[in-house]
Amino acid sequence: MEEDDEFGDLYSDVLQPFQPPVVLPPPPPLPHRSIDLNLRSQDQDVSEPNSAPISRVSDNDAVKLSTQDATRQAIVDGGGDDKDMSFDIEEPDADSTPTIPGLFVTGALPGLATDRGVSQVTTRIEQQVGGGGDGGYGGQGEGDDWDSDSEDDLQIVLNDSSRNVMIGGADRRSRMGDNEDDDDEDDEDPLVIVADTDPNQPMEEQMWGEDGLQGIEGDGKDGGEAGKGSGPGGATGPPKAGYSSHGYHPFHSQFKYVRPGAAPIPGGAASVGGPSSGQVRPPANLGPMAGRGRGDWRPLGMRNASAAQKGFHQPWGSNTAGRGLDFTLPSHKTIFEVDIDSFEEKPWRYPGVEMTDYFNFGLNEESWKDYCKQLDQHRIQTTMQSRIRVYESGRTDQGYDPDLPPELAAATGAQGVPVDSSNLVKPDSVQGDSAKVPANVRPTLPPGRPIPVETGSGERLPSIDTRAPRMRDLDAIIEIVCQDSHEDEPSGENGTDQADSSLPGENVPVETSYVNNKRPDTESAEHSPAQDEPHKNLLKKQDDEISRSTDSGQSFRSSSPVGDRGTRSSSVDREDVGGEAGKDAEMGEELKMSFTSPQSAVQEDDGGESKTERSSESSKARSGSHRDFQQEEDVIQDKHSSRPANNRKQYDNNAPHQSRKNQDRGKEMERTRAASKGGRENSNPHMELDSTYIYSIASREDFDKRKERDVDGAVWRRKEDDPYSRRGGDEGSRKRDREDDPGFRQRGKMRENEIRSKDDQVPSRKHMDDAGMRNIYEPDDHINKRRKDEEYLRRSRPEKNEISYGQRESMSRVKRERDDRLEHQKRDVQHKIRDDFDDHGSLRQRDDIYMQRDGNERLRERDVLDKLKLPHEDGISARGRERQVAVRGHRGSEDRSSRMKDEYKASDKEHVTKDTLRHAKQTKRRDYPGEESSSHHRGHEDFSARTDNIVNNEKKPRQERTGAKIDKFIDTLDGQRLQDRKHKDSRRKIKEQREGTESLSKQGEQNGSSVVTGSKGTNDARNCRSEIPHQPNTAKRHKENASSGDEIHDSKRGRTKLERWASHKEREDAVSAKSSSISSKLEEKENNTNGRLSEPVHGSIGKSRDVTEEKIGHDLADTKDGSEKGPGDRHLDTVEKLKKRSERFKLPMPTEKDTTGVKKMESETLPSAKIEGPVDSEGEYVWDERSCVRIGREYA
């Protein structure tokens, strides 16, 4: 036969429309052989080529077939045509047999195997109409239906292990044939040919009777018999294998089921055997089968369900699902759910039928039922267990749950039941719900655990997991922390380097900017607005404090390298190096700087070189944390408290590098000075960034950084503990305030130029200054400083007076004045000790000596202050207000309160400067060097001491503060008095005013405004409060009133004090009615009595001071008595003061009457206003710390 006609062609017929096969005469019916024989005979000799019966199936035959004819194994599936389909079963060599998937090449098609044991079967499908019958499955005859369905849709699937389908193929077929009725041709055809689209469809379309249980050409009986017992009958039976074969591999048939639209499984025709079980049609009446089977059993046009049912065979031997094509098993069901008992026909019960053809695993009908029951039970158990697990998943109690439903409770005991029966079924067998399939049973989980859920891509993950990490924020935070630690932590001499390297990009530029005096620039540039905000706030606060409590003029010369940081040591180094002259200037400034608060230091650091600001720049710019700024402040203070030795070490270690660094910084400072001025001014409106100031900033910065390097946390703690360092910082802020002053700025500019030149020449000096080597810088610088300071003092007296007012406000000023005295003394010592910060101790000792000298006086002053404190405050409230009103009238809107301190100190300093310039530069130098040295010392120690003095002076009477200042003040006052005596006639009023102012300012400054807090403290505090804003005007007016430059200076001072002492001047007039000579003597005596003249400025002046001091005690008592005069005089004074205020220093000197009234008022106020101390005979008050009496000064 041609290859086309062989199984290959047959297989192609499955996929392609059948070629009209050559019609072969039907061979004689094959001897009846059992399916087993057929199955076995497949391996037998092929010696009988004709052994394979050729089944011609025609519609006529199918119609004629009766139940007896059913034995005829001619099966035509959908072969409605009369065309003969002859299945030629040839026995060519086994090797030549075409291989059909699922079909043994050597074996005869199931059911086609004959008794001859045809090993090779060539099936020729003869279809005249192209209707295909499976030759291997049996002649599928003619079927017109075949044509319509089989050409495209017919797929013959042969299962090589068709033995299950074939089981008892011929016999079953014969049975089927016997049972099938001829009533309907469609119904009688047991052969089911699987169609591509719907395996059930072809059969639905096909009339079973038509496709007919056709016997092999021969009697239906023969066919039936052959179907039962003969292989040929079995061979004719195979067409039914098409039915059963669809989707039923003998190995998989029980596990896989024909689903609607499912493609037939190759070789799945296990029922290829002629009457093989696969040929069994689903019974017509098998609707949904009874039992668990929920499958849709379709009659498929079966008219004789009984016949079909009789012939029905389940190849897998279990439930009716065996019908395969007829039975549509829902995808959610399994064969195990089909109840085989519902089948009317049970072919496996036929004698000679191989049970293995129907049941696998050695099961039989009963065992299968048992197995199904076990599966049911197991499914129930697993289902209940799973439910129980779900139910108990949230329960921690593993014990019996009374709320557990009985079913679940019963199933709970079955949890431990082994799933042994599941082993009976291949895992493949599980097609149904996992809950029902034991193989799908999940291992039980201990109760109480959450239900295991397999993660899927679609599941929602926690946002924390899905959220992209924000590394920037983390980095920024970490960076801030690191920066804080780096900046705040000292690392010996490397601290600066580390600080620089901590944020190499930021820190270094900041350092450089600092050193270059660009630091303000860099700082302002680097400072974020938030950074500038704190600085500006600090600066504003500092400015307020400075205006209140610090002398604007005193703004510590930290504008020079000394005072930038306000560090005691750095300022001492620079001021010491600067020399006495520099000290003189700086001393006045430092006195002005009388440290208000550590915040001032912070601001000084901000305005000057505030490392705080620097750290805030670095740390804030880098980390943006204000905490760093605060830490920097502390560190700065600590660093300031570090001794010059450390600084020198730092300089020595870092000198070369620092020199280079300073050079670079100097250049960079110059480049960025303008920007730094802008930024610094932005950050610190008071600060115009004198180059000197910038230099000092840079120097201090370097110095601080070196300190950071060299200074350990302990040193910093010492610095923190050291009030002077904080004072120095505040003084630095004062210095910034001074920088706001034009004179100070000019001086700062001069210094800046000098500093620039020095920076260019000795860039390391900045570091040296910072490292305690400021002495190198200081000598020349202080000379210029002194000059600038002198000019500045002249200009800044009003500011000093303003600041002195703030000093007056605090009784703690007494302490500050003491400190100021000590500071002046220390300054005197400091210009000697400039090179060594450690000499501060000696300065302190000397200050202690001075304090011992002044101790008694201060004790007296304290006693007096305590006694007069309330009266003094009252007097201040009354007369001071009047004076303030007058002074306000004179001075306008100037800051009176802040300038009071400055006025006292500034006026003292100004008078000291002027008198010194005019009369005794030596005395002035004594005063200034003392002041400078003490200001340097204060810058390191006394700055904070002065600041404390200011605060304490504000808290305490001024009398105590006058102690130390009175000495120098008296010295300068003596020289001034000499000049005043010379100019008595011409400048009598001016001198009186000026001297009063000098005495007040100097005493207030030296005494920390504590002595001034005496009699003057009350009146002057009031007047000065009002006068503080007027001081500049007063100075100007003094200039106008001054007949000469000296007189102008005196008049400036005097005017500033005149403004303060408008009422005092009136009193002075009254006192002048007395002998001016007597008043002058009294002044000298009172000055001597004030005890501040521990050192007579001049021999004659010293003597006069001694006499005056001796008289002061008496005068004090007299003044006290006089001060008890009725307040009416005070009011008179106030009225006159107001008038004079309107005159703005054009006030005529008060008449003797007025002065007398004023004296009375003041004398009356004195007991009440302890501050009102010695008053000139003219009414000018000389604040005596101890006696707080008014010394009337009268110039003949």
From Swiss-Prot:
Name this protein carries in UniProt: FIP1[V]-like protein
Acidic residues bias locations: 142-154, 179-190
Biased composition (Low complexity): 268-278
Knockout or disruption consequences: Lethal.
Principal localisation: nucleus
Compartments it resides in: Nucleus
Chain location of the short sequence motif Nuclear localization signal 2 per the record: 734-741
Biased composition (Basic and acidic residues): 518-548, 565-592, 608-641, 661-673, 699-802, 810-918, 925-945, 953-971, 1046-1071, 1103-1137, 1151-1163
Tissue expression notes: Expressed in leaves, stems, flower tissues and roots.
Biased composition (Gly residues): 129-141, 226-236
Residue ranges, compositional bias (Pro residues): 18-31
Family named by the database record: Belongs to the FIP1 family.
BP GO annotations: mRNA processing
Record organism: Arabidopsis thaliana
Pfam families: Fip1
Disulphide bonds in the chain: none
Any GO CC annotation of this UniProt entry: nucleus
Motif Nuclear localization signal 1 positions after renumbering to this chain: 704-711
Keywords in alphabetical order: mRNA processing, Nucleus, Repeat, RNA-binding
Bias (Polar residues) ranges: 117-126, 549-561, 643-657, 998-1021
